[in-house]
Amino acid sequence: MAADEEPDSPSGALQTAAEEEETKTFKDLGVTDVLCEACDQLGWAKPTKIQIEAIPLALQGRDIIGLAETGSGKTGAFALPILNALLETPQRLFALVLTPTRELAFQISEQFEALGSSIGVQCAVIVGGIDSMSQSLALAKKPHIVIATPGRLIDHLENTKGFNLRALKYLVMDEADRILNMDFETEVDKILKVIPRDRKTFLFSATMTKKVQKLQRAALKNPVKCAVSSKYQTVEKLQQYYLFIPSKFKDTYLVYILNELAGNSFMIFCSTCNNTQRTALLLRNLGFTAIPLHGQMSQSKRLGSLNKFKAKARSILLATDVASRGLDIPHVDVVVNFDIPTHSKDYIHRVGRTARAGRSGKAITFVTQYDVELFQRIEHLIGKKLPVFPTQDEEVMMLTERVNEAQRFARMELREHGEKKKRKREDAGDDDDKEGAIGVRNKVAGGKMKKRKGR
């Protein structure tokens, strides 16, 4: 066969298809010029795999089921077709996006507003934890896009005079598997009954569970499936490790890793709100720029933590699983599972915070004597044996005394904070990220810890 005919071979054809995918632009997908310019301004040089799959079909008016790994550009895959359609037929209350969490709702709103800034797109975020009256006023202005959690949206549909979605053209269910796992099925059913049947529906999910399949049958008409990753797959450029350590030395090993990989951004997952707060205080006492994000914080403080981390004002975000899905934090270099997830699928979503959209990243999971069975389930789920993260145990043990001292002061601060909350429920200050307790931190032997350069 001649050299110029080589693409006719199976391997040559695959290579050509991959090269074509690499060179595709948003314009090639059918996105209008004004939105292509918005993509350029956001630094979206080229579409991701899920965008290449989903956008042309969505622009043809098809219902879409999008299955893609976390961090694959799912928001752009549904936002661009919706904005494209809005440009052609401008209308208020044009699209509804349902999400499982408040944080994800704000993230999606930011992307819609950024992409649609030049065409004057107006969004309303309708979530719990925020005053209903201000949301009612926002809905009265009839925004183009409503981004909502199901529970609060039902509240407004039932109680906000004059608000309805009878003219809705697009419905998006993002992180649909999680919406259903959080027992929002009843609310979703109610919403489906009060919106037009003649609409376009996009369902995006990390996994195709039985509940999602049931929802697909109820909500979508002749949908096209766009899948760019297999079930429970972790992204290719993610380096995954584990550390088998005694439970009592978890804090010490965490400090060692933060020093060894200094200069990176970290997302550290803890199992409880209390442990998240305690570990954040411990790390601050040792001079690290750590900030917590958990469900016991107010909505404004949670968004404050998230924004400081996104702006790189803080390099370490400690979070419960409330932050493990859907949040747009593109610069996480290392994920640490400080507490191993109880549900194996949560491992996929946690480590999906790094190695996003083609970048590389590390994930390190702490395994104690109590976690062996959970860890084996994770390895079985992802279909691979993880290597051990290399450590120098002698160097780790040298940190023990100072870490123990920082632990004591962290516990003291937690107690003081708890007593203060009892005395004064309304706390106007930003206790979750103030640089206070300076006296306590200065007592930690040696002050700030010397950090090594990252590997």
UniProtKB/Swiss-Prot annotation:
GO terms for molecular function: ATP binding; ATP hydrolysis activity; RNA binding; RNA helicase activity. Residues 1-21, 412-455 are annotated as: Disordered. This is Probable ATP-dependent RNA helicase DDX47. The modification Phosphothreonine is found at T149. Residues 55-226 form the Helicase ATP-binding domain. It comes from Mus musculus (Mouse). A motif (DEAD box) lies at residues 174-177. The modification N-acetylalanine is found at A2. Residues 237-397 form the Helicase C-terminal domain. Keywords: Acetylation, Apoptosis, ATP-binding, Helicase, Hydrolase, mRNA processing, mRNA splicing, Nucleotide-binding, Nucleus, Phosphoprotein, RNA-binding, rRNA processing. Gene3D superfamilies: P-loop containing nucleotide triphosphate hydrolases (3.40.50.300). GO terms for biological process: extrinsic apoptotic signaling pathway via death domain receptors; mRNA processing; RNA splicing; rRNA processing. Interacts with AGO1 and AGO2. Interacts with GABARAP. Interacts with NOL8; the interaction is RNA-dependent. It catalyses: ATP + H2O = ADP + phosphate + H(+). Its main location: nucleus. GO terms for cellular component: nucleolus. Its EC number is 3.6.4.13.
